[in-house]
Amino acid sequence: MKYSELGKTGIKVSRIGFGVLTVGGSQLNLPVAEGAAVLRYAFEKGISFLDTAQYYQTYPYIREALKGGRFEPVIASKCLDYTYRDMEFAIEEARKELDRDIIDIFLMHEVRNDPDLELRAGAWECLNDYKAKGIVKAIGVSTHHTDVAHKVVDIPECDILFPL
């Protein structure tokens, strides 16, 4: 497996990541033990980057896969919410459900257009605060939209643009 630094974050990840959505309830709906076994297999093959999100409801799979401390993948999670309070809840939920003090990467999820980005100012403020506290290592935006991508690359605090 080849590994690279993720932008200027200092975070090293495998060039192949694992989208955890697939094992959860909205897709394969695997039992937690079975989904965790799939994740451990990916780790054994060298995959060190997991992509998840609050609404995927896949934290139990990841937590189970990490029991025993043998693997320490980089975990990126995302949240659809707009307000500071809701983003804070999402980060704290991830910390609790993943049994981690620090979240590697946290993103605003599926930002749809410029007004959507602006409406999430509270969520963005929260991400910046949690990064400043050292609770989140890197922050950014996930999007399907090129206009959002063009705007996000000019935001100095944005560590990661995650085009979907």
Regions found by a protein language model. Give the residues of each.
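N-terminal binding-site loop/beta-alpha segment at the start of enzyme catalytic domains
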Residues: 1-73
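Structural preference for beta-strand elements that scaffold enzyme active sites
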Residues: 5, 13-17, 48-49, 72-76, ...
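Short, histidine-centered active-site or binding-site loop motifs used for metal coordination
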Residues: 20-22, 43, 79, 107-112
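Glycine/proline-rich, positively charged
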Residues: 26-27, 40, 84-164
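Short, flexible segments with low predicted structural confidence
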Residues: 33-35, 78, 99, 123-124
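N-terminal start-of-chain detector that recognizes signal peptides
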Residues: 35, 47-49, 77-81, 133-134
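Structural motif corresponding to the early beta-alpha repeats
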Residues: 54-56, 68-89, 109-112
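Short alpha-helical
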Residues: 56-60, 82, 146-148
